[in-house]
Amino acid sequence: MAPSPIMPRYHVGPMASTRRAISKKGFPRTRSFPVLTAPLDYLRDSPGKDIRSGLTDAFNEFLCVPEDKVVTIKRIIDLLHNASLLIDDIQDDSKLRRGVPVAHSIFGIAQTINSANLAYFLAQQELKKLSNPDAFAIYTDELINLHRGQGMELHWRESLHCPTEEEYMRMVQNKTGGLFRLAIRLLQGESRSDRDYVPLVDTLGTLFQIRDDYQNLQSDVYSKNKGFCEDISEGKFSYPVIHSIRARPGDLRLLNILKQRSEDLMVKQYAVSYINSTGSFEFCRGKIDCLAQWANLQLAALEEAEGAGRGDKLRAVLRLLDMKASGKQADVAS
């Protein structure tokens, strides 16, 4: 039978085998048009550290949700996380993600946006498999939060407005905390436990983002995966950058470097040296240590209430995020 001119027959190659592998893991795929999911599949071919999946498993030691529901929730978070990365890389004009060229440099901006949008709705479709009637409302709530956070970060960059630390913290709670919270709120909705784990999740989300900001400017491993000091080239007001600018309000050098969105190696090295001269990396490390200590205290309180030993997996995640325990080069990036 000849291929239809309306429904072309696509070549079955390496990408198709990737989709089959993903499907075996329980991830939804689009059977009719493999090109629809190609950017998403490409990103999944270079998996990150999957810390969100690890956190879901760790919190489930307390919540005891049935495995089939956990798998569904992890699938939802995986789809949303990878979709958000596709969009982030376009908005930030990124060059590398996980050590390979970004998806839109391979498939084009339009197709990558469409693939990301499709993933949002594939994730939404998965909500039908959950028993909590509030799952859709939770999903909508946290996706709105995620876009609020992303919108504020983009606004600061485009208007060259340096936010306060308080404004930055609110942005992080929305942007980074959104998916962390979504996973745990969906878990809580499937659990018999009435204990609220969101405060600890919020601490972990903030810890993760500030650590990520630090790594972007200080980690050799991070540079290999995303490029040297990518946040400087993006003009991003990250945590150490905000502290550095506000440490010397009358000095416009760093602000002007961000304005240039420079890819020049020497300019970026100068920016890192300037940030270091204001004590901002030291300040950042102190904040990370403080958040890690607070998260450990929150976890200890939960273990005291729920029973010792349930927090072993969460403690392992905290060790991974702890700069002193893991070393500053440890990479937990997306």
UniProtKB/Swiss-Prot annotation:
It catalyses: isopentenyl diphosphate + dimethylallyl diphosphate = (2E)-geranyl diphosphate + diphosphate; isopentenyl diphosphate + (2E)-geranyl diphosphate = (2E,6E)-farnesyl diphosphate + diphosphate; isopentenyl diphosphate + (2E,6E)-farnesyl diphosphate = (2E,6E,10E)-geranylgeranyl diphosphate + diphosphate. PROSITE patterns: POLYPRENYL_SYNTHASE_1, POLYPRENYL_SYNTHASE_2. InterPro entries: Isoprenoid_synthase_dom_sf (IPR008949), Polyprenyl_synt (IPR000092), Polyprenyl_synt_CS (IPR033749). Its cofactor is Mg(2+). Pathway: Secondary metabolite biosynthesis. Mg(2+) 3 binds at D212. The keyword Metal-binding applies. Disruption phenotype: Simultaneous disruption of idtB, idtC, idtF and idtG eliminates the biosynthesis of the whole spectrum of indole-diterpenes reported to be produced by C.paspali, including paspaline, paxilline, paspalinine, paspalitrem A and paspalitrem B. Its EC number is 2.5.1.-, 2.5.1.1, 2.5.1.29, 2.5.1.10. One of its GO terms (molecular function) is metal ion binding. The record marks Y120 as: Important for determining product chain length. Binds 3 Mg(2+) ions per subunit. It comes from the Eukaryota. Mg(2+) 2 binds at D88, D92. Dimethylallyl diphosphate binds at R97, K175, T176, Q209, N216, K226, K236. Keywords: Magnesium, Metal-binding, Transferase. Isopentenyl diphosphate binds at K49, R52, H81, R98. One of its GO terms (biological process) is isoprenoid biosynthetic process. Mg(2+) 1 binds at D88, D92. Geranylgeranyl pyrophosphate synthase; part of the gene cluster that mediates the biosynthesis of paspalitrems, indole-diterpene (IDT) mycotoxins that are potent tremorgens in mammals. The geranylgeranyl diphosphate (GGPP) synthase idtG is proposed to catalyze the first step in IDT biosynthesis via catalysis of a series of iterative condensations of isopentenyl diphosphate (IPP) with dimethylallyl diphosphate (DMAPP), geranyl diphosphate (GPP), and farnesyl diphosphate (FPP), to form GGPP. Belongs to the FPP/GGPP synthase family. This is Geranylgeranyl pyrophosphate synthase idtG. The lineage of its organism: Eukaryota, Fungi, Dikarya, Ascomycota, Pezizomycotina.
